[in-house]
Amino acid sequence: MQNMVILGATGSIGASTLSVISANPDAYRVYALVANASVDKMLALCITHRPQVAHMVDSQAALALQAKLPPELNIQVSSGEDELIALVTATEVDTVMAAIVGAAGLVPTLAAVKAGKRVLLANKEALVMSGELFIEATKASGATLLPVDSEHNAIFQCLPEEVQANLGRCDLAASGISHILLTGSGGPFLTAELASLAAMTPAQACKHPNWSMGPKISVDSATMMNKGLEFIEARWLFNTQNDQLKVVIHPQSVIHSMVQYRDGSVIAQMGNPDMRTPIAHCMSYPQRISSGVEPLDFFKVGQLSFCEPDFNRFPCLALAIAACAQGQEATTVLNAANEIAVEAFLQGQIGFTHIAKVNEACLSSVPKRAMTSIDDIIALDAQTRIYAREQLAKLA
């Protein structure tokens, strides 16, 4: 029986994780649920899954949850960063699902890694921001790191065992690998007229053709910044050079990514677009458990198509690839700028095409600094957010 902590329990990844746990009740136990401020959602999850601890990042939300929880459930309610770190590093905890969206997930995820936990990484921003520090912490602690993102999980499944066992430190060329092919659907605006993009609304941007996701990642998919962040994450997870990574547009989201070998072979991982599949794989690796997902029906799949990304349509993807080549400081700046810009777009403060403009302005203007600690990363992140908000004021 594995005791699990779910960071981001009220989000879409949290819901999918709890679904897999419910399908395998003899193998997994919900030790703790962690959320930001969604009291009613957390209350419902507590009643259903009976965790030992419910942690709310927002202190007022924690008080509200405590008042609403039936006392007979005997669930401890906590709040605060120190309490969260103590939770993910507790000796009772075996596995941590790291699914808090954005920079907010970095500190608890890194704490779980340093404690040597089995970490299921759905928070791509942790690697985008801290890259080498994160990988070195994994190596030092002996933590098990497993990628949950559908693309990185697909790549992982297509790799030989010696690479799977050495994430972040592997040598792809030595294992006969020539390229990693990172697939992406192109999002809801793949075929939209370029001139129409400036007028796209948050509702339109969040209407992904294949996946059910939260608002932030949905907008990132529409700009293809999500694929850019995944490009950066893949660079660290699989220790790649930029020329070993290629982005392929695949609108149907049936092939989740591919690995191309030196002998001309290409191994692909396929399946229905449902996050329960990669979550179940990570939870049970190297074994397999039921995810509750229907298997792919090849007689109903139809045509699979592929094309190269259009960087005029997706400037955020181009920015991310360029930032990856520049190094850790640039990717930290880009992530912070993008979080501010996307939130402003979702609130109706800026237009869709302004997201890329804010990101580009921050990348070109925020002074870079050497980053040797988590404090350096947090400081650069904070500095970038201030500058990004200044750019928003100019666009308003």
Swiss-Prot record:
Among NCBIfam families, the record links this protein to: Dxr, PRK05447.1-1, PRK12464.1
What molecular functions are annotated in GO for this chain?
A: 1-deoxy-D-xylulose-5-phosphate reductoisomerase activity; manganese ion binding; NADPH binding
Which Cys pairs does UniProt list as disulfide-bonded?
none
Among the GO biological process terms of this entry, one is: isopentenyl diphosphate biosynthetic process, methylerythritol 4-phosphate pathway involved in terpenoid biosynthetic process
Lineage, top-rank taxon, reads Bacteria
Q: Spell out the SUPFAM superfamilies in the cross-references.
A: 1-deoxy-D-xylulose-5-phosphate reductoisomerase, C-terminal domain, Glyceraldehyde-3-phosphate dehydrogenase-like, C-terminal domain, NAD(P)-binding Rossmann-fold domains
| Name of the encoding gene | dxr
Give the organism the record lists: Shewanella sp. (strain MR-4)
Record keyword Oxidoreductase present? yes
Pathway membership of this protein?
A: Isoprenoid biosynthesis; isopentenyl diphosphate biosynthesis via DXP pathway; isopentenyl diphosphate from 1-deoxy-D-xylulose 5-phosphate: step 1/6
Residue positions binding NADPH = 10-13, 123, 125, 214
Q: Where does 1-deoxy-D-xylulose 5-phosphate bind?
A: 124, 150-151, 185, 208, 221, 226-227, 230
Instruction: Spell out the protein name for this chain.
Output: 1-deoxy-D-xylulose 5-phosphate reductoisomerase
Report the family membership: Belongs to the DXR family.
